[in-house]
Amino acid sequence: MSLTKEKKAEIINTFGGSDKNTGKTEVQIALYSRRISDLTGHLKEHPKDKHSRHGLLKLVGKRKSLLAYLKNTEIERYRQVLADLDLRK
């Protein structure tokens, strides 16, 4: 269910440019998006899992705040992230 080291490193390399650039906003948004999609799949199988649903809502809120920050500071990077991750806004 959780991200493996390899998948996490792949996401970091794709959005950060190098494996050391983990603090970049795009990397954080991509990692949150991957965890959100994993949790969504889990909740489809286990609809009564309220604790996981609460965690999912927290992750969505964190991703939303990072997207808002990116939109206010770098609109072009924001649009690129939306296109790369197939997020709607």
Curated annotation (Swiss-Prot):
**Sorted alphabetically, which keywords does the UniProt record give?**
Ribonucleoprotein, Ribosomal protein, RNA-binding, rRNA-binding
Q: Name one GO cellular component term.
A: cytosolic small ribosomal subunit
Cite the InterPro entries for this sequence: Ribosomal_uS15, Ribosomal_uS15_bac-type, uS15_NS1_RNA-bd_sf
Q: Does the record bear RNA-binding in its keywords?
A: yes
Against PROSITE patterns, the record matches this protein to:
RIBOSOMAL_S15
Known partners and oligomeric status: Part of the 30S ribosomal subunit. Forms a bridge to the 50S subunit in the 70S ribosome, contacting the 23S rRNA.
HAMAP family given for it? Ribosomal_uS15_B
Designated name of the protein: Small ribosomal subunit protein uS15
